[in-house]
């Protein structure tokens, strides 16, 4: 596995849940970045560890960390700023844990839902290569929200690829977009009249009968984020 030695960064950190988790695993140097502050009751970590900044503008004189994490944030940044967002993220570390919403995944203020291949091209342009090491092991683990199981990839600066290969970890040069069954069920139910939506029932059938697992604990059939753009 790829580990860090006590330093971590995340772009779009919200209340700092990833920072809290990193600290619990021994990280000692932490920094979070987001566009807007969150209420005190939503904080998982000290507020002073979180910097409020414009993630769409190129950051200068960035500190370097052992790993940078951005999960389900990039879709909230307009496509005209996507290159800058990824450049900022890579400016923090040679190792980046990244996920972003697929098209029609849905959510609040999703203005740039894109396929994995779209983001992969942007990382490749900065000399990073993908390692698809999380999706298969966690695909059917309903304790984890499906969008993490569907979208999480590790991006690593190419100079570290051979080191990872010596540890038996191979890169995925062209990672593919994978649509999780829960997203399919969500999309189908969203298209149904409200009184006919059966996401939780459908997901229970999927998890308990098809794969022998527990049903997910949340109904993700809330509104779709981008329809407001089409008016």
Regions found by a protein language model. Name each.
Residues 175-231:
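Membrane-proximal basic amphipathic "stem/tether" segments
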């Amino acid at each position: 596995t790829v580990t860090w030695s006590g330093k971590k960064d995340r772009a779009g950190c919200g209340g700092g849940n990833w920072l809290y988790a990193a600290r619990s695993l021994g990280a000692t140097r932490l920094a979070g970045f987001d566009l807007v502050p969150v209420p005190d009751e939503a904080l998982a970590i000290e507020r002073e560890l979180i910097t409020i900044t414009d993630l769409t503008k190129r950051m200068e004189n960035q500190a370097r960390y052992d790993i940078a994490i951005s999960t389900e944030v990039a879709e909230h940044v307009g496509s005209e700023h996507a290159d800058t967002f990824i450049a900022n993220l890579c400016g923090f570390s040679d190792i980046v844990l990244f996920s972003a919403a697929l098209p029609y995944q849905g959510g609040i203020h999703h203005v740039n839902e894109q396929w994995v291949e779209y983001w992969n091209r942007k990382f490749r342009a900065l000399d990073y290569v993908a390692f698809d090491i999380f999706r298969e092991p966690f695909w059917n683990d309903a304790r984890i929200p499906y969008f993490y199981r569907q979208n999480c990839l590790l991006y690593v600066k190419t100079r570290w690829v051979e080191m990872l290969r010596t540890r038996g970890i191979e890169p995925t040069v062209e990672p593919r977009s994978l649509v999780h069954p829960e997203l399919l069920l969500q999309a189908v139910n969203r298209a149904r009249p409200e009184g006919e939506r059966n996401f939780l029932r459908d997901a229970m059938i999927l998890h308990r009968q098809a794969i022998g697992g527990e049903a997910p604990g949340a109904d993700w059939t809330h509104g779709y984020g981008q329809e407001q753009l089409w008016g």
